[in-house]
């Protein structure tokens, strides 16, 4: 029997969900999950440590490390190889903004679950 899904908490949805090379046809498509996007946002944009990111997402630090490695690989593949990057899916729940571990950027807004 498999383990039940442990939902990853995210604080905000991406404002843009598709990125593609300008001036040339994409050389393929990569899908980054919303929880992978959240680790990039928290660790690279908000300068959170893996530990802080793990607390914000309600997962173990080792889980964050794995998610982050996968996200960075996908991001590099899209940038270097000229692939379209789509951000969608994943195992997540949107936070309500009332959690003490919520890490929101000023430029982002919480979206209610029915708006996603």
How would you label these PLM feature ranges?
Residues 15-34:
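Short, Lys/Arg-enriched anionic-surface-contact patches
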Residues 72-79:
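C-terminal flanking helix
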Residues 109-116:
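Conserved small/polar residues in nucleotide/adenosyl-binding loops
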Residues 36-40:
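Short alpha-helical "packing" element that flanks the helix-turn-helix/winged-helix DNA-binding module
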Residues 43-46:
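Short helix-to-turn junction characteristic of helix-turn-helix DNA-binding domains
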Residues 55:
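Alpha-helical residues within the helix-turn-helix
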């Amino acid at each position: 029997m498999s383990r039940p899904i442990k939902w990853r908490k995210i604080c905000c949805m991406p404002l843009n969900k598709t990125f593609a090379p300008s001036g040339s046809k994409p050389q393929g498509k990569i899908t980054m999950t919303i929880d992978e996007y959240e680790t990039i946002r928290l660790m690279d944009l908000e300068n959170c440590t893996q530990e802080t990111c793990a607390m914000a997402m309600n997962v173990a630090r080792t889980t964050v490390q794995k998610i982050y490695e996968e996200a960075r690989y996908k991001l590099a593949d899209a940038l270097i190889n000229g692939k379209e990057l789509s951000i969608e899916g994943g195992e997540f729940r949107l936070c309500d903004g009332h959690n003490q571990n919520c890490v929101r950027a000023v430029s982002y807004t919480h979206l209610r679950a029915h708006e996603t």
